[in-house]
A protein has these predicted regions:
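Beta-strand C-termini and the immediately following turn/loop, strongest in propeller blades
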Residues: 14-21, 28-30, 63-69
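Serine-hydrolase catalytic core recognition
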Residues: 10, 39-190
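Generic long, charged, amphipathic alpha-helical segments
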Residues: 1-7
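Short loop/turn segments that connect beta-strands within beta-propeller blades
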Residues: 30-33, 79-81
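Trp- and S/T/G-rich repeat-edge/linker motifs of beta-rich repeat architectures
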Residues: 1, 34-43
């Protein structure tokens, strides 16, 4: 878990935290008794999120950019405490209806929990017969985040395939302390 960014508005601070390979937005609000924390209304469960203030001197509005495995990059405007209003979107290159994003955790030999994302058709039977495209990367503290790919969507997901992305050690999703034990001779533990 690490701070990926944040912004201030007239009455709040919005923190963008990378947690288990996905962004999570939190709203911090000052009061006479200290700060309170709440979830950002309408933030996606899985995806890459960018947040920036519109005019921090005058309003509590923020710009949001969001993308995930099934959603091309979108630009939205949100007032703190209200759901975002989508303003623009990049074109969709495949039909994402009937598809679902999930996150699971595998356990490595040393007991480390390794998050992975699964993009699959709804109603999928877990019987081992589903063609699956698995990608895992962990190096140079470069995180693999949930992003949109028209090629994977059109060429694989639309045809009923399953896509999996593993956030293995080394990718920086949990910082250098998590990555160090999986270097050199210990790389198979990743």
């Amino acid at each position: 878990t690490w701070l990926a960014g944040g912004t201030g508005t007239k009455g709040h601070v919005v923190l963008n935290v990378l947690e288990d390979g996905k962004n999570r937005l939190s709203v911090l609000t000052p009061s006479a008794s200290g700060w309170t924390t709440s979830a950002f209304v309408g933030a996606p469960s899985f995806g890459i999120v960018g947040v920036g203030d519109v005019d921090s001197d005058e309003s509590d509005a923020v710009w949001l950019t969001v993308t995930d495995y099934l959603t091309p990059t979108t630009l939205s405007l949100a007032e703190i405490g209200q759901p975002p209003e989508q303003l623009k979107s990049m074109p969709a290159f495949f039909d994402a209806s009937g598809k679902k994003i999930e996150q699971h955790f595998a356990t490595s030999k040393d007991g480390t929990k390794v998050p992975y994302f699964l993009v699959r058709p709804e109603g999928l039977k877990y019987d081992g017969s589903n063609p699956t495209l698995l990608y895992g990367y962990g190096g140079f503290e470069i995180p693999m985040l949930p992003g949109y790919s028209g090629g994977v969507g059109k060429g694989w997901l639309e045809k009923g395939g399953v896509s999996a992305l593993a956030n293995i050690s080394g990718g920086g999703e949990y910082g250098p302390r998590r990555d160090q034990p999986a270097l050199n001779a210990h790389r198979p533990q990743a």
